[in-house]
Curated annotation (Swiss-Prot):
Its cofactor is [4Fe-4S] cluster. Binds 1 [4Fe-4S] cluster. The cluster is coordinated with 3 cysteines and an exchangeable S-adenosyl-L-methionine. This is UPF0313 protein MA_4618. The keyword Transmembrane helix does not apply. Gene3D superfamilies: tm_1862 like domain. Residues 106-115 have a biased composition (Basic residues). Residues 1-125 are annotated as: Disordered. Keywords: 4Fe-4S, Iron, Iron-sulfur, Metal-binding, S-adenosyl-L-methionine. Residues 1-128 are annotated as: Unknown. The lineage of its organism: Archaea, Methanobacteriati, Methanobacteriota, Stenosarchaea group, Methanomicrobia. Residues 438-707 form the Radical SAM core domain. Residues 17-40, 49-73 have a biased composition (Basic and acidic residues). Pfam families: DUF3362, Radical_SAM, Radical_SAM_N. Residues 129-742 are annotated as: UPF0313.
Length: 742
């Protein structure tokens, strides 16, 4: 499974120059700009505000005291590459401003509000969550309302906060509705009708993962809700919220985003219902999906709606998913059936250009009935998630056709710096009377980079953030750290520095700029690729400078360390042991059976043993007593009872017994979930064993906790079933003692 071959010929990454199929510039329409054109309409998403307080700038409104110039060196995000390979024109001829407001679907003119809000209350540092907060800012209406399944925490570890601040920075008036009631639309009406659109997210995690255990039982805690309370978001939050919004405001555009919408953008296996569900845009009454890290996409959408475009015509933004009518799709396919490419180009140039840029995968009807077709569809779209060479994907559904545009490019270093230095308060909204546990975990942490080239089969980060690493500059991270030290509750400890993985900061590959991450091989599996720059030099410099900041006593890594990478740089490993571990280092070998680690695309136990030896040696050298805490997994595709017994024996022999154990949970768009549903490796076509029986899954988990008296019966039954009763008795090698069954 390590080598993932590509079966289709890729086109080059050269932008299409045919003006007929690129987004037309509106230079000739300068005299027809909308009344409320925003700051940041030049070339970038984030343009430093230079209007003076109290004077009207490009917003057409008073700047309301927020006109401080940004510090030098904070670059904006360029929009120049947004549509350079666009295939379908948003509309023929010049775009006309929608009569009833940007993006709306009615022809009626909106009535102007006669009453203007005014208040002597100071404007909150937070984005508004109530009509009173909107009023305190002197606003008549909001441009965009973000709806989320999480509590509102204004911290850069929370997706809603990032999107809200990015839109605010681009000049839009943004409000947030967090964890609304979903039995009726009233909560969704409290901030009124947004002028542009609603954006809907389930929160930082898929709502099914937030609400349910791997055994599909309700969770007892929800770290993203005040006081760990459960029941504050529905299952399938994105669909439910969208339906309630449509009831309240039938003609307001809805844009979906976040992890739940992103990873359900195609027909997908749904663990709760144990069946294949339609793409989320086929189930939710929404207009677009923003997939992946959505800063570039969401601001481009906002600007184009602001300019008067109909959201139904916005079809060329990378990193978005849109719907096509079944009839239109059939007509497009018919036009593209020319006897050869030249004929098709002459008779139906639009269709020919479309099929040059998009690939059709098996339809919902096919993948829901044929597991081999599901695996084929998965393999195709998995290999097209490269922002440099990836093509768009088309998947027909019974009542609509889902079209995913090619992925959006990653942010540059300067852009990422800018995003993470926006004016987050770093706190939960003051309306909450109980703490948000998820904030407590990251409050004094620093995000250094995005992306992960680890390639673990069960992880969706690659599909959401991409394999290519984008790192913040050292100076940007230091500026944020300095602000942390100024907080009154800072105790001198920075408890996390990293990203999806702690030690990929500053790493890269010489091929990424031209072709993106390789499609025919993984970066770390079955071994670290020699073309990868695995130097930890930049990370070491950052950690050293963080330690030297006044007021900082300790800087801990906090995030998971990729130990196969750490072995590539002994200087990093020594520094890690000397300065950056608080007593325990958490790593994730996940399993010790080769068959299972191969299915997971994880390094095997020999690599783990090398790391353990080095870790012990460096701890001895620096005179510290520190320990490894292993994260392990049961029930992963490819894992049998024999594999779990092998794991238990390894833990017995190496003293690695741990409580940090999780059952495999199938979540959309991961390789492991594809294997779980189909029983096939999507890259080789080989069959994969999958434990789906609840009893066997319980036995697998029990074997990792074989010492627990509560698991005796399950462990005994597993050993008996596997023919390993030699491990029952009083001998040293035995996992459990022989006794009469209770």
């Amino acid at each position: 499974m390590g080598v993932r071959k590509q079966t289709m010929v890729k086109d080059t990454a050269v932008p299409i120059e045919n003006k007929k199929f690129t987004r037309e510039k509106k230079d000739k329409e300068k005299d027809k700009k909308p009344d409320r054109e925003r700051a940041g309409r030049k070339t970038g998403f984030f343009v430093p505000k230079k209007v003076e307080t109290g004077k009207k700038g490009k917003l057409g409104r008073k700047s309301e005291g927020k006109a401080e110039e940004k510090a030098e060196g904070k670059a904006g995000i360029s929009t120049s590459t947004i549509s350079e390979r666009a295939v379908l024109k948003p509309s023929a001829g010049k775009r006309k401003k929608a009569e009833s407001g940007p993006g709306t679907k009615t022809g009626k003119k909106e009535k102007k509000q006669k009453k203007s809000f005014s208040s002597s209350l100071p404007a909150s540092k937070f984005l508004p969550m109530s009509p009173e907060e909107v009023k305190a800012r002197g606003w008549k209406e909001l441009d965009i309302i973000l709806v989320t399944g999480d509590a509102y925490v204004d911290h850069s570890s929370f997706g809603t906060a990032i999107i809200g601040r990015v839109l605010e920075d681009a000049g839009f008036r943004v409000g947030i509705i967090a964890q609304p009631r979903w039995d009726n639309p009233e909560d969704l009406k409290k901030l009124g009708r947004p002028r542009l659109f609603f954006s809907v997210s389930a929160g930082n995690t898929d709502s099914m993962v937030s609400n349910l255990t791997p055994g599909l039982k309700p969770r007892k805690k929800d770290a993203y809700s005040p006081g760990n309370k459960t029941g504050l978001r529905p299952n399938r939050s994105v669909i439910i919220y969208s339906n309630r919004i449509k009831e309240a405001f039938p003609n307001v555009p809805i844009v979906l985003g976040g992890i739940e919408a992103s990873l359900r953008r195609f027909a997908h296996y749904d663990y709760l219902s144990d069946k294949v569900r339609q793409a989320i845009l086929a189930d939710a009454p929404a207009d677009l999906v923003v997939y992946g890290m959505g800063e570039l996409q969401i601001v481009e959408i906002a600007k184009r709606l602001q300019a008067g475009e109909d959201i139904r015509k916005i079809r060329d933004i990378p990193g978005t998913v849109w719907k096509m009518e079944v009839r239109a799709w059939k007509e497009l396919k018919e036009k593209g059936k020319g006897t050869n490419e030249a004929v098709a180009r002459d008779t139906a140039p639009e269709a020919a250009e479309f099929f040059k840029e998009y690939i059709e995968i098996p339809s919902f009807s096919e993948v829901s009935q044929d597991k081999a077709a599901f695996a084929k569809a998965f393999r195709t779209y998995f290999l097209e998630q490269n922002p440099i060479t990836g093509k768009g994907i088309v998947q027909p559904h019974p009542k609509t056709v889902i079209v995913q545009n090619r992925p959006m490019r990653p942010l540059t270093e300067a852009e990422l710096d800018h995003v993470y230095e926006l004016p987050y308060t770093g706190e939960a909204h003051p309306s909450y009377t109980e703490p948000i546990p998820a904030l407590e975990m990251v409050k004094f942490s620093l995000t250094t980079h995005r992306g992960c080239f680890g390639g673990c089969s069960f992880c969706a980060i690659t599909q959401h953030q991409g394999r290519m690493i984008t790192s913040r500059s050292i100076e940007s991270v230091l500026r944020e750290a300095k602000k942390l030290t100024e907080k009154p509750d800072f105790k001198g400890i920075i408890n996390g520095v990293g990203g999806p993985t702690a030690n990929m900061y500053g790493m890269g590959c010489r091929s990424w700029e031209k072709q993106g991450a390789c499609l025919d091989k993984a970066c770390l599996y079955p071994r670290v690729c020699p073309a990868l720059d695995t130097s930890h030099k930049k990370l070491l410099e950052l950690m050293k400078r963080l330690r030297e900041l006044p007021g900082v006593k300790h800087v801990f890594t906090g995030y998971g360390v990729r130990y196969d990478l750490a072995l590539e740089d002994e200087e990093y490993l020594e520094e890690l042991c000397t300065h950056h571990i608080s007593g325990q280092l958490r790593i994730a070998p996940e399993h010790f059976s080769k068959r299972v680690t191969d299915a997971m695309s994880k390094p095997g136990k020999k690599v783990y043993e090398r790391f353990s030896e080095k870790f012990a040696a460096f701890n001895k050298k620096c005179g510290k007593e520190q320990y490894i805490v292993n994260y392990l997994m049961s029930g992963h595709p490819g894992c049998t009872l024999k594999d779990m017994i092998e794991m238990a024996e390894y833990l017995r022999d190496h003293g690695g017994y741990t409580e940090q154990v999780q059952d495999f949970t199938p979540t959309p768009m991961t390789v492991s979930t594809c294997m779980y549903y189909t029983g096939l490796d999507p890259f080789t076509g080989k069959k994969v064993y999958v434990a789906k029986d609840k009893k066997e899954k319980a036995m697998q988990r029990a074997l990792m906790h074989y010492r627990s008296p509560a698991n005796y019966e399950l462990v005994y039954e597993a050993l008996e079933k596997a023919g390993r009763l030699d491990l029952v008795g009083n001998a040293h090698k035995c996992l459990i003692r022989r006794k009469e069954k209770q």
